[in-house]
């Protein structure tokens, strides 16, 4: 049984798990990782492992030298690899008498509120039982529009869901740099990132391996999601899993992202990062100030443009005049209705729409600001 409230989510990527040339699993990494996570569990930490590698393992099993690009092939190869991957984890953890559970998620499990809550309850029960859940995206059934796209985002959403204290992103570099150190000799290491301080990095240039789907840009997105939920995030070298206890003890290893001082509520986090926006609203400067600085609801008068087609209750992006996304929210009107009442005063809504609508386009209770 768990003896502490501290939950640690560890994500290991394909580039750390597998050989970049052959796609074969690196047992020299997996073995120490399993030992470290088991040790943490016995110390009283609640531990969740988010593991990539199913496609890479599947390719190796089939003798493929390159990662497939066709969706059907990727899903089939993932089905081949996931079974072998979880079997290996079970063998390694069983040798240390540590029970594990396989948890395969799709984006749809987090989009629908009832499924989100149920997934959270399942994690809570597993952790209470002293089990280490091993999480991966269910690539075999996930449709392209509802994919996480990378396990960095998945790990951050899981950390947010279970209200973890730590998210450790194990990758193929020691830490975050201002640019790709392999290409730019002036690249500077970044030791710590504080909330609210702009981060100047060339994340897109810090690439990914041929077997993975992530990169440094996806890890920054993951850090944004997790820190908004009050989670401390660390990016560090996946080939050194033995450093994880030292990180939890406060040693300056890798790049640390400090959590937001006032984490958003679970519902606001679900709106901001769990849902998939179906459109966007462009706001004028006054509406941006009202929403972002004064914590007010969005009125139709502050909307200058609508993009996309959606119904009332859909999730949408809220953008400033330059197109920068500043918030997400659940709309009270459809896209067609909003096009009729954008820029109009609240008192004019009944005359324009022909019925007594609500005053707000997005109520502040259904609106979540982004970092």
From Swiss-Prot:
GO biological process assignments: L-proline biosynthetic process
Assigned GO CC terms: cytosol
Enzyme class: transferase
Classification via Pfam families: AA_kinase (PF00696), PUA (PF01472)
Domain PUA, residue spans: 278-356
CDD domains assigned to the protein according to its UniProt record, in alphabetical order: AAK_G5K_ProB, PUA_G5K
EC code(s) of this entry: 2.7.2.11
UniProt lineage: Bacteria, Bacillati, Cyanobacteriota, Cyanophyceae, Synechococcales
GO MF annotations in UniProt: ATP binding; glutamate 5-kinase activity; RNA binding
Binding site for ATP: 11, 171-172, 213-219
Chain's role: Catalyzes the transfer of a phosphate group to glutamate to form L-glutamate 5-phosphate.
Record-given protein name: Glutamate 5-kinase
Superkingdom of origin organism: Bacteria
Keyword terms, alphabetized: Amino-acid biosynthesis, ATP-binding, Cytoplasm, Kinase, Nucleotide-binding, Proline biosynthesis, Transferase
Native source species: Synechococcus sp. (strain JA-2-3B'a(2-13)) (Cyanobacteria bacterium Yellowstone B-Prime)
Sites where the protein binds substrate: 52, 139, 151
Main location: cytoplasm
PANTHER family (alphabetical): GLUTAMATE 5-KINASE (PTHR43654:SF3)
Compartment annotation: Cytoplasm
Biochemical pathway: Amino-acid biosynthesis; L-proline biosynthesis; L-glutamate 5-semialdehyde from L-glutamate: step 1/2
InterPro entries for the chain: AceGlu_kinase-like_sf, Asp/Glu/Uridylate_kinase, G5K_ProB, Glu/AcGlu_kinase, Glu_5kinase, Glu_5kinase/COase_Synthase, Glutamate_5-kinase_CS, PUA
Entry's family note: Belongs to the glutamate 5-kinase family.
The reaction(s) this protein catalyses: L-glutamate + ATP = L-glutamyl 5-phosphate + ADP
Keyword Metal-binding: no
């Amino acid at each position: 049984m768990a003896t502490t409230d501290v939950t640690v989510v560890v994500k290991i990527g394909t580039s750390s798990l597998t050989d970049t040339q052959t796609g074969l699993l690196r047992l020299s990494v997996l073995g120490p990782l399993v030992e470290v996570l088991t040790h943490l569990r016995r110390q009283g930490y609640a531990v969740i492992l988010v593991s990539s590698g199913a496609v890479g393992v599947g390719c190796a099993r089939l003798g493929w030298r390159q990662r497939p690009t066709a969706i059907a092939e990727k899903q089939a190869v993932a089905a081949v690899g996931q079974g072998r991957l979880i079997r290996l984890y079970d063998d390694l953890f069983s040798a240390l008498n540590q029970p594990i559970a396989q948890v395969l998620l799709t984006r749809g499990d987090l989009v629908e509120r009832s499924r989100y809550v149920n997934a959270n309850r399942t994690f809570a029960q597993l952790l209470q039982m002293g089990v280490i859940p091993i999480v991966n995206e269910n690539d075999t059934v996930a449709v392209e529009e509802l994919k996480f796209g990378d396990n960095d985002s998945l790990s951050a959403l899981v950390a947010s869901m279970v209200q973890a204290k730590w998210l450790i992103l194990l990758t193929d570099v020691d830490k975050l740099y201002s640019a790709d150190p392999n290409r730019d000799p002036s690249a500077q290491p970044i030791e710590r990132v504080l909330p609210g301080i702009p981060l100047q990095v060339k994340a897109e240039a810090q690439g990914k391996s041929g077997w993975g789907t992530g990169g440094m840009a996806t890890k920054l997105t993951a850090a944004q999601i997790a820190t908004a939920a009050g989670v401390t995030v660390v990016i560090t070298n996946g080939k050194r899993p033995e450093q994880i206890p030292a990180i939890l003890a406060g040693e300056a290893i890798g790049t640390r992202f400090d959590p937001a001082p006032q984490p958003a509520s679970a519902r606001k986090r679900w709106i901001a990062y769990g849902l998939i926006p179906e459109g966007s609203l462009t706001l004028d400067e006054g509406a941006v100030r009202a929403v972002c600085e004064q914590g007010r609801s969005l009125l139709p008068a502050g909307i200058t443009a609508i993009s996309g087609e959606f119904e009332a209750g859909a999730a949408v992006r809220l953008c400033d005049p330059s197109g920068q996304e500043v918030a997400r929210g659940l709309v009270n009107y459809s896209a067609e209705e909003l096009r009729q009442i954008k820029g109009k005063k609240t008192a004019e809504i009944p005359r324009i729409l022909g019925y007594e609508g609500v005053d707000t386009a997005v109520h502040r209770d259904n609106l979540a600001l982004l970092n």
